[in-house]
Amino acid sequence: MRAAEDLVSLGESRCAQPRKSMKRICIDRNRPLAEEPHTGHNRFHPGIAPICAVAPGEEILLETRDAFDGQLPPGSDDRDIARMDGGRVHPLTGPLWIEGAAPGDGLEIEFLDITPEAHGVSCILPGFGLLRDRFPDPYLVHWRIADGWATAERLPGIRVPGAPFLGVSLRASAS
């Protein structure tokens, strides 16, 4: 990934264009992962073919999808939780092939910049989680992320540090 000052916006695609030549994995947030399988997967397995090869020390720009693959956009409500397609959740960008890496090698990945979207969600999914018996109904919160903070109209007076969170980053096993 590159620092923000080295990126130029491409407008609606929301993919950043590096000033210098750099590999990029860009996504269309208006389409589900199933319509863009060349960008990733959502069921990690070592048999999934890499989407891009990266040399040691090479920088690459990756875009990621939200945990629900865009199924809870701004304007969605509690009822939309029940309509979600569970087969679409947890989309992952990748995998990447690291040139020269072999089984047993230790790999170091440095994330140079993580830029969150301006909108995020959190929700209570019926039947899931530690407190599922106490919270049986769906509950959706839309977060506005700006200036380092996340706020939500549904939770007045609550302000949470809006620290970017990648989700997961993992290395494939040899088999």
Question: What do these predicted regions represent?
Answer:
Residues 73-89, 120-133:
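Short, compositionally biased
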Residues 54, 98-101:
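Short, well-ordered loop/turn sites that connect or cap secondary structure elements
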Residues 47-48, 92-95:
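Short, solvent-exposed loop/turn positions at domain surfaces
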Residues 23-84:
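N-terminal, Lys/Arg-enriched amphipathic/low-complexity engagement segments
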Residues 113-175:
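Intrinsically disordered, low-complexity linker/loop segments enriched in Gly/Pro
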Residues 65-69, 112-117:
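Short, charged beta-turn/beta-strand-edge "cap" motif at the junction between a beta-strand
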Residues 62, 106-109:
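A generic structural signal for residues embedded in beta-strands
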